[in-house]
């Protein structure tokens, strides 16, 4: 479900693109931006 999806950690990987995305930071209690790519 959507709730369990929001509990996943941010994962760093390799890519040539740079796309702004957001994830829910459970420690901060809010969405935070990261660069996907």
From Swiss-Prot:
InterPro entries: Kunitz_BPTI, Kunitz_BPTI_sf. GO terms for cellular component: extracellular region; nematocyst. It is found in: Secreted; Nematocyst. Residues 6-37 form the BPTI/Kunitz inhibitor domain. The keyword Secreted applies. The keyword Transmembrane helix does not apply. Pfam families: Kunitz_BPTI (PF00014). It comes from the Eukaryota. Its main location: secreted. GO terms for molecular function: potassium channel regulator activity; serine-type endopeptidase inhibitor activity; toxin activity. Keywords: Disulfide bond, Ion channel impairing toxin, Nematocyst, Potassium channel impairing toxin, Protease inhibitor, Secreted, Serine protease inhibitor, Toxin. Dual-function toxin that inhibits both the serine protease trypsin and voltage-gated potassium channels (Kv). Belongs to the venom Kunitz-type family. Sea anemone type 2 potassium channel toxin subfamily. This is Kunitz-type proteinase inhibitor AEPI-IV. It comes from Actinia equina.
